[in-house]
């Protein structure tokens, strides 16, 4: 067999091929190492991100633990979420929580109800001032502060004119560092409700200006007669105020003109609001309140419905001339003096015989206050509040089995374990000695303001 002879040119080609394969292998190994390093870095970074996310969630849970209610949500959401958990039964099946809540609610209402007869200004002029700044976009009140306050303000207008029919109200909003008048001072509740519904669609913007709002309220209350009280109710949600000048001068002018200011705070306490309430209420700091939840906000609005007691610093007494007009019925429409519109019927002023549409109002011709006797009676109950009914003890022998007012049988709530009554469910008037159920008790004190037992007594002539 002949030997194989390899030329020099073939050897050179083999060397070049081996060198190229080696370089490609080295290059591939380098790229593989780089890819492995990149994968390891990405894997480690994802682990770090995951650990940071877990730590943030743990910190958030720890920080929100104090804000959580019994049902796992926020504390202010316990009122609505899983409300059926509030009614619980014990081992014997008694609805202990339900009875306890009724008794507790009554005790709370009785403790807060002030039955001391004070001299109060029943002819009121109130300026309702609402914060419509960016702070009202907070959602600690559902769905947010702005929507909640507008709804509660509408309810407040209804209740205010129901309990104070011969009073007047105006509405101001604070927005973009300015004060805007949305409803003139008048005694027509529908005008104020329509104005509140219109600003419900507006988005809160900017910062509030407490000084501008107080100056506008002062200007609206200047023409008010001396026999009327001058009040300003402010709903303030921000923690600061953007004022164009010295607000302390505005406070001094409010004090000199006997304008009393009450502030309902939605956030933390603000020093200038505390100073404002203290200066305008003869040193009383209790007129600045900070709400706790939605129920507390409703209670604060209800407190503002009751007229303020007249301070001893105020001078003397004022006799107010009032007119009781007669109702007229017409077959053809005639012009009224209050709106200059054609209307059927109305009321004739007994002083100048001008025609007005509705009551109560002030005659646009002679400035005489025109009211009905029922309006005066509804305002009078603030001066002489009805006494609180006393709960009948369970150990006493009951006089009757039916409520004197609604004629319904009193409920019997016993403990199945020992057979004792949990509560008598009877509340007695100290004057007429008649007994009422809890529903009639609440209705009599909050709406009727007259005891049916006392009113049904025969009049001795």
Curated annotation (Swiss-Prot):
Spans annotated as Disordered: 1-70
GO terms for biological process, alphabetical: nucleotide-excision repair; regulation of transcription by RNA polymerase II; transcription by RNA polymerase II; transcription initiation at RNA polymerase II promoter
Chain positions of all zinc fingers (C4-type): 349-366
Bias (Basic residues) ranges: 53-63
Keyword presence, Repressor: no
Record-given protein name: General transcription and DNA repair factor IIH subunit SSL1
Location in or out of the cell: Nucleus
Pfam families per record: C1_4, Ssl1
The protein's assembly and partners: Component of the 7-subunit TFIIH core complex composed of XPB/SSL2, XPD/RAD3, SSL1, TFB1, TFB2, TFB4 and TFB5, which is active in NER. The core complex associates with the 3-subunit CTD-kinase module TFIIK composed of CCL1, KIN28 and TFB3 to form the 10-subunit holoenzyme (holo-TFIIH) active in transcription. An additionnal subunit, TFB6, plays a role in the dissociation of the SSL2 helicase from TFIIH after transcription initiation.
Principal location class: nucleus
GO molecular function, one term: ubiquitin protein ligase activity
Cellular component per GO, a single term: transcription factor TFIIH core complex
Other observations noted: Present with 2340 molecules/cell in log phase SD medium.
Compositionally biased region (Basic and acidic residues): 26-37
Transmembrane regions: none
Positions of the VWFA domain: 125-304
UniProt cross-references to InterPro entries, sorted A to Z: C1-like_sf, Ssl1-like, TFIIH_C1-like_dom, TFIIH_SSL1/p44, VWF_A, vWFA_dom_sf, Znf_C2H2_type, Znf_RING/FYVE/PHD
Organism: Saccharomyces cerevisiae (strain ATCC 204508 / S288c) (Baker's yeast)
Chain's role: Component of the general transcription and DNA repair factor IIH (TFIIH) core complex, which is involved in general and transcription-coupled nucleotide excision repair (NER) of damaged DNA and, when complexed to TFIIK, in RNA transcription by RNA polymerase II. In NER, TFIIH acts by opening DNA around the lesion to allow the excision of the damaged oligonucleotide and its replacement by a new DNA fragment. In transcription, TFIIH has an essential role in transcription initiation.
Record keywords: DNA damage, DNA repair, Metal-binding, Nucleus, Transcription, Transcription regulation, Zinc, Zinc-finger
Family indicated by similarity: Belongs to the GTF2H2 family.
């Amino acid at each position: 067999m002949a030997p194989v002879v390899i030329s020099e040119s073939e050897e050179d080609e083999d060397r070049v091929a081996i060198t190229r394969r080696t370089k490609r292998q080295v290059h591939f190994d380098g790229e593989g190492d780089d890819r492995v390093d990149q994968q390891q870095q990405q894997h480690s970074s994802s682990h770090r991100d995951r650990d940071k996310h877990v730590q943030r969630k743990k910190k958030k849970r720890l920080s929100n633990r104090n804000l959580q209610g019994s049902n796992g949500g926020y504390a202010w959401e316990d009122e609505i979420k899983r409300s059926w958990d509030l009614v619980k039964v014990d081992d014997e099946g008694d609805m202990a929580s339900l009875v306890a809540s009724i008794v507790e609610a009554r005790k709370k209402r009785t403790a807060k109800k002030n039955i001391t007869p004070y001299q109060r200004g029943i002819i009121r002029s109130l300026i309702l001032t609402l914060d419509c700044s960016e702070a009202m976009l907070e959602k600690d009140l559902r769905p947010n502060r702005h929507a909640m306050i507008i709804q509660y303000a509408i309810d407040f207008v209804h209740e205010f004119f129901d309990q104070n029919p011969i009073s007047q109200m105006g509405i101001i909003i604070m927005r973009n560092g300015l004060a805007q008048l949305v409803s003139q001072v008048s005694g027509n509740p529908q005008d104020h409700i329509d104005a509140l519904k219109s600003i419900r669609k507006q988005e809160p913007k900017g910062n509030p200006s407490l000084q501008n709002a107080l100056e506008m309220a002062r200007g609206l209350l200047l023409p008010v007669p001396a026999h009327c009280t001058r009040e300003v109710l402010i709903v303030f949600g921000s923690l600061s105020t953007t004022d164009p000048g010295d607000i302390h001068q505005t406070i001094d002018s409010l004090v000199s003109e006997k304008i009393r200011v009450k502030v309902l705070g939605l956030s933390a306490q603000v020093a200038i609001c505390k100073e404002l309430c203290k200066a305008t209420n003869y040193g009383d700091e209790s007129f600045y309140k900070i709400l706790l939840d939605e129920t507390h906000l409703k209670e604060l609005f209800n407190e503002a419905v009751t007229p303020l007691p007249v301070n001893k610093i105020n001078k003397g007494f004022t006799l107010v001339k009032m007119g009781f007009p007669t109702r007229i019925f017409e077959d053809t429409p005639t012009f009224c003096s209050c709106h200059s519109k054609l209307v059927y019927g109305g009321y004739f002023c007994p002083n100048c015989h001008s025609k007005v549409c509705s009551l109560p109002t002030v005659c646009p011709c002679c400035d005489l206050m025109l009211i009905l006797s029922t309006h005066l009676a509804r305002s009078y109950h603030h001066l002489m509040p009805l006494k609180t009914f006393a709960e009948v003890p369970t150990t006493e022998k009951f006089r009757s089995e039916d409520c004197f007012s609604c004629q319904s049988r009193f409920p019997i709530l016993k403990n199945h374990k020992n057979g004792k009554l949990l509560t008598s469910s009877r509340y007695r008037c100290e004057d007429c000695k008649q007994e009422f159920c809890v529903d009639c008790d609440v209705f009599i004190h909050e709406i009727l303001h007259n005891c049916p037992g006392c009113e049904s007594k025969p009049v001795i002539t």
